[in-house]
Amino acid sequence: MSKNIAVVCGSYHKKEIELMLELAKDQADKEGLTISQVVWVPGAMEVPLALNRIVNANGESLVGAACLGIIEKGQTQHGLAMGQAVLKSIIDLQLSWNKPIGLGIIGPGAEPEHIGPRLEPHARAAISAISSML
């Protein structure tokens, strides 16, 4: 039986997230998981809704999901507030579905120099988290 997962990707930093998605696919293969669905959303705020829709539509065929994105540091606390709200929503969804969600969101508060070095570890860790919780 295939262990299917979905991945939700924020498109605001599309170039970086496309790289993260390729790394996530490689890690999924190593972990014996199949990425059966990829959904692109505008940014981190849309991730919880997309996750909810995916699991509601495909829940029986999915063992988990991952999200990939970046929340940069801005000049206000908007990114921090947004990051906290998104993370809480993701945890709530994970608990209500009883399915693991791998968090591959860099930030909040990521400075430009923080992004590059974190792309691979965050992408791979998001997939490994799913595998370890099955």
Residue positions per predicted region:
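Short beta-strand segments at enzyme active-site cores
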Residues: V38, V63-L68, P100-I106
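Glycine-rich phosphate-binding loop
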Residues: A50-S89
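Short beta->alpha junction loops
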Residues: Q37-E46, G107
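Glycine-rich phosphate/diphosphate-binding loop of Rossmann-like nucleotide-binding domains
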Residues: S2-W40
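Generic secondary-structure signature for well-ordered alpha-helical cores
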Residues: E22, D29-L33, N52-N56, I91, ...
